[in-house]
Swiss-Prot record:
Organism the protein comes from: Shewanella sp. (strain ANA-3)
Described purpose of this protein according to its UniProt entry: Catalyzes the attachment of isoleucine to tRNA(Ile). As IleRS can inadvertently accommodate and process structurally similar amino acids such as valine, to avoid such errors it has two additional distinct tRNA(Ile)-dependent editing activities. One activity is designated as 'pretransfer' editing and involves the hydrolysis of activated Val-AMP. The other activity is designated 'posttransfer' editing and involves deacylation of mischarged Val-tRNA(Ile).
Name of the protein in question: Isoleucine--tRNA ligase
PANTHER family, alphabetized: ISOLEUCINE--TRNA LIGASE, MITOCHONDRIAL, SOLEUCYL-TRNA SYNTHETASE
Main location: cytoplasm
Family label: Belongs to the class-I aminoacyl-tRNA synthetase family. IleS type 1 subfamily.
Length: 940
């Protein structure tokens, strides 16, 4: 017996079956860095149309978490796919480097500025700490396979960026959007600073809910307004509040002009009380107060009570009833306790009536020394003392512990207060900023589209933006204010330009070191330097100008895309929109894409206390970054993104399917040189031409999905192609031809040409997602090529040719369906132990006329499609009793074990085996492939 094994074209490749990604990816990263891969990509796109994705800067504090990974991987997929589409798509990563969290970390190390360390030294320590944090996060991001300008990222603490932030503020001022005011702002007593909207979280809190009586200064006259003459009891208006500590700042009682208000007399414990309440709430209030009996003495509209005076319950002054649109009857009494220094609505309505904006509370949440009754007490601890004083004064009608949603500091997780302080604001309405921003929102594409209505509502309802902070580590608000008039210096814009030039050379410390006389000369005595710093949301929100507008690789093109988590509608998307519109009248972006948050397999937020945190570092060390990247791409990011060990293992299974497909392609391109072996598409075997045509159609679908940022559709189509069209059909069928046909013959080279085209296309399809694996495939593909797939464009040689004589795509799809039915019957025969494998079978297909015409069209090559040694087609009417019905009404099948001898080389059972004297163990086909010109295949 001859050894025919050496006459077979066995698959061979250096591409291993196991990816071993956790170990191999770092080796690839070293090569990428050594070769300057990112710069190679940049050089390959010189002069092309730019596509600018601007990186929203993560905060330079702590290790990256799974949410960071999702964000960076999505950005990387977009940048790489846009590059593949021919764009010049630079990616400059950035970091947010100023602000309180860094200050707090540095304080733990060196103490607060002014104690053991000067403010200048403290800032330098903050700068060092932020740089260390950037280094740690950068290494983790690079490990994910994210390509970018990692050696020259943008940092908001770079001197040039700090200077540009100041320049952007000067433009906002020049355009008339800045004003100073005393306004209630979110204030964290632990931070000792104002908070931005985006720094506020809502959590449940238990507060004292109290009903407080404000007695009228002239009860008899007030009762008369309700139609009750000569009334002898004191009449009180009742408020309901959950912040007793704000009562020292009360300056009015707000009522609704349109509501009906009732004068109610009720008896309790032998005493008679007369109170004014919203009519619709009378019954609820009487129940709450434990009234033994009550009667409504009269009703009036709220507007009739405007400016009636009431005595403060424990301070020696009286306050007016005023009209406010913010009054509701959802809870309480229909009368709102109004403290303009401690509430936004209170402040707005107070401005209309010229009320004092009283703020008896210091930065640390403690009442100031001149606060009667409560000086030196912390506001939240004073709540009980306020309640006790009200009880003592006879003004407390009801008191209960009340659980409700309350604003908390996102850093300290502690309750915050509204507190009026002198601050700098960007006005939403003075120069029509709100109106302009809403108009720009309409010009922007929001993905998903619900993002538009979300940010519109936020802009419609947001107050002026308080951009000042009382911090040490931040970009200074570089203004000079007149010591007496508090007016800005008339040359503020030009002065800021000179200060910015200094900051560009020396950093923000230049402002603190600056002697005002250097810039103002003799005027210096009349002006003081502002010591406030900018809200860090201003830092990041101005980077479209301070970074994108300044760095040469962006070509002054402007930003095409912002991409962040859905919490950034009120964060970075909002601050960027406000600053850009204030500076230029235009939005800073053309598209805004948001992704959901990561949750565990049960839909819960990641939490160390629950123990469900999945660290990206652990995933890359165990499974590899490509598995994490595949999970990100395969997940519909428009909603919550579910991740768990089980889900990642499923991604690893999906990855193996793609890897195995790539390995099959490479292994079967062994010995193929496209320069001399490539068969023109029009000369290919019909099935090969179909495979190329199918790949061409799929490539269009994949490119479209990339363009629409639908990466989960890319992965779905890729998996379908690998598993069904290739794995279960095309690759399965061609194995016989690939392994047994003449090595240099047309039948094999046709097949290899199709595999080559598919591999060239597929390596590009996967490159944005499975970047490491794509690089690995690229290095092993035959033919002359550039060093990296990442400098390429989508494969152009997938010619979708259909010849007049060709079988249609529908034909092959029908054949795939028939093949699936045949496989079911063969599998049953194998389970019944009637045959060993499919090549041990002879199949008879009983088909109707239409199907018979299709099946017989490819003649004897039908058996190669069905992977059987023999395939006969007979009329459906001739079906035997042993024939098995299929899911196709037009087809019945009969499978029998073949009686023919088995060819030693191809394993097909053929009648002629044993009849060829020189090769008694071979079939005719194999002899032709060994000694002749090779078999002829037309169809499969």
């Amino acid at each position: 017996m001859s050894d025919y094994k050496f006459t077979l074209n066995l698959p061979e490749t250096e591409f291993p079956m196991r990816g071993n990604l956790a170990n191999r990816e770092p080796e690839m990263l070293e090569r990428w860095t050594k070769d300057g891969l990112y710069q190679q990509i940049r050089d390959s796109r010189i002069g092309r149309t730019p596509f600018i994705l601007h990186d929203g800067p993560p905060y330079a504090n702590g290790s990256i978490h799974i949410g960071h990974s999702v964000n960076k991987i999505l950005k990387d997929i977009i940048v790489k796919s846009k590059t593949m589409s021919g764009f010049d798509a630079p990616y400059v990563p950035g970091w947010d480097c100023h602000g309180l969290p860094i200050e707090l970390k540095v304080e733990q190390k060196v103490g607060k500025p002014g104690q053991k360390i000067s403010a200048a030294e403290f800032r330098e320590e903050c700068r060092k700490y932020a740089a260390e944090q950037v280094d740690g996060q950068r290494a983790d991001f690079i490990r994910l396979g994210v390509l970018g300008d990692w050696q020259k990222p943008y940092l908001t603490m770079d001197f040039a960026t700090e200077a540009n932030i100041v320049r952007s503020l000067s433009k906002v001022i020049e355009n008339g959007h800045l004003h100073k005011g005393v306004k209630p702002v979110h204030w964290c007593t632990d931070c000792g600073s104002a908070l931005a909207e985006a720094e506020v979280e809502y959590e449940d809190k238990t507060s004292p809910a109290i009903d407080v009586a404000f007695t009228a200064t002239d009860s008899k006259a007030l009762a008369a307004q309700f139609g009750v003459s000569d009334y002898s009891h004191p009449v009180a208006m009742v408020i309901w509040t959950t912040t007793p500590w704000t009562l020292p700042a009360n300056r009015a009682l707000s009522i609704s002009p349109e509501l009906d208000y009732s004068l109610v007399e009720f008896a309790k414990e032998g005493a008679t009380h007369a109170v004014i309440l919203a009519d619709v709430l009378v019954e609820a209030c009487m129940t709450r107060y434990g009234a033994e009996s009550h009667s409504v003495l009269g009703k009036v509209k709220g507007v009739a009570l405007e400016l009636v005076r009431f005595k403060h319950p424990f301070l020696a002054f009286d306050v007016p009833a005023i009209l406010g649109d913010h009054v509701t009857t959802d809870a309480g009494t229909g009368v709102v306790h109004t403290a303009p220094g401690h509430g936004q609505d209170d402040f707005v309505v107070g401005q209309k009536y010229g009320l004092e904006v009283a703020n008896p509370v210091g930065d640390n949440g403690v009442y100031k020394p001149d606060t009667e009754f409560f000086a030196g007490q912390h506001v939240f601890k004073a709540n009980d003392n306020v309640v006790a004083l009200l009880k003592e004064k006879g003004a407390l009608l009801h008191h209960v512990a009340y659980r409700h949603s309350y604003p908390h500091c996102w850093r300290h997780k502690t309750p915050i207060i509204f507190r009026a302080t002198p601050q700098w604001f960007i006005s939403m309405d003075n120069q029509n900023l709100r109106k302009q921003a809403l108009s720009e929102i309409e010009q922007t594409q929001w993905i998903p589209d619900w993002g538009q209505s979300r940010i519109e509502k936020m802009v419609e309802n947001r107050p002026d933006w308080c951009i000042s902070r009382q911090r040490t580590w931040g970009v200074p608000i570089t203004l000079f204010v007149h010591r007496e008039t508090e007016e800005l210096h008339p040359d503020s814009v030009s002065l800021m330009a000179r200060v910015a030039n200094r900051i560009e050379q020396e950093g923000i410390q230049a402002w603190w070191d600056l002697d005002a006389a250097e810039l103002l000369g003799e005027e210096a005595e009349q002006y003081r330097k502002v010591t406030d710093t900018l809200d860090v949301w201003y830092d990041s929100g101005s980077t479209f100008a301070s970074v994108v507008g300044a760095r040469p690789e962006f070509h002054g093109h402007g930003v095409d895309l912002y991409l962040e988590g859905s919490d950034q509608h009120r964060g970075w998307f909002m601050s960027s929109l406000m600053i850009s519109t204030a500076m230029t009248g235009k939005a800073p972006y053309k598209q805004v894409l948001t992704h959901g948050f990561t949750v565990d397999g049960k839909g819960r937020k990641m939490s160390k206390s629950i123990g469900n945190v999945i660290a990206p570092q652990q995933v890359t060390n165990k499974l590899g970054a490509d598995i994490l990247r595949l999970w990100v791409a395969a997940t519909d990011y428009s909603g919550e993104m579910t991740v768990s060990d089980e889900i990642l293992n499923r991604s690893a299974d999906a990855y193996r399917r793609i890897r195995n497909t790539a390995r099959f392609l490479l292994a079967n391109l062994n010995g193929f040189d496209p320069a001399k072996d490539l068969v023109a598409v029009e000369d290919m075997v019909a099935l090969d031409r179909w495979a190329v045509r199918r790949a061409a159609a799929l490539q269009q679908e994949i490119i479209e999905a990339y363009e629409q940022y639908n990466f989960h559709i890319v992965t779905q189509k890729l998996m379908q192609f690998c598993s069904v069209e290739l794995g279960s059909f095309y690759l399965d069928i061609i194995k016989d031809r690939q392994y047994t046909a003449k090595q240099e013959g047309h039948a094999r080279r046709s097949c290899q040409s199709a595999l080559f085209h598919i591999a060239e296309a597929m390596v590009r399809w996967i490159a944005p997602i499975l970047s490491f694996t794509a690089d690995e495939v690229w290095q092993l593909l035959p033919g002359q090529r550039d060093a990296y797939v990442f400098t390429q464009e989508w494969y152009q040689d997938l010619q979708s040719i259909t010849l007049d004589t060709d079988l249609s795509d529908a034909y092959w799809e029908n054949l795939l369906t028939v093949r699936n039915e045949v496989n079911k019957v063969i599998e049953q025969a194998r389970r019944d132990k009637r045959i060993g494998g499919s090549l041990d079978a002879e199949v008879t297909l009983f088909a109707d006329a239409a199907l018979t015409e299709q099946l017989t069209h490819i003649g004897d090559e039908l058996r190669f499609v069905l992977l059987t040694s023999e395939a006969k087609v007979l009329p459906l009417a001739d079906a035997t009793s042993d024939a098995v019905e299929t899911e196709l009404a037009s087809l019945k099948l009969e499978v029998n074990a073949t009686t023919a001898e088995k060819c030693e080389r191809c394993w097909h059972h053929r009648e002629e085996v044993g009849t060829i004297e020189a090769h008694p163990t071979l079939c005719h086909r194999c002899v032709t492939n060994i000694e002749g010109d090779g078999e002829v295949r037309l169809f499969a």
